[in-house]
Amino acid sequence: MLKALPITEYLGGRVHKISDKIYHLIRGEVFEIGGKKILALGGAESHDKEYREEHKTWWRDEAICNSDIRNALSNLSKCDNKVDVVLTHIPPSKFKKQIIQEFTQCGEDTPLYIEPKLANTASEELLKQVEKVVRFKCWFSGHLHTDTHIGKYYSLYDYVVPIKI
């Protein structure tokens, strides 16, 4: 569906234009919003595909792929690998490990909604290529369905957090 939409440039990056006020940020693009550089790199595998129906509740192209990473690395190189904000669906591997350690150190079981997401996926392995080179001030993700903040990393679920950088 998204691939059928027209592609245009908006705020310095390529987007799919959905309507006059709604845009889909293409994976791997860097945008300048409010004077801040933002890398958009959404996508993740559904961990519960067996309960979903293809083309209705899950899609094969929902996961990050090699071309998304190539696009991100190419766009990052144009800004010396520096952005203010990274927006992803899946968290970087380092942050995911820290969240799990935090639950363990508190004597809590890892929440059931995180359990299926513990194994590294193909998207997470690909994302490591970006993790190695990008320099950023804050990184936001939402896949773990928990509200947690550790250093420069944010996992958001219910919270809305203003970007103050």
Where are these regions (language model features)?
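Conserved beta-sheet core of the metallophosphoesterase superfamily
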Residues: 3-4, 8-20, 95-165
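Conserved acidic residues
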Residues: 28-29, 143
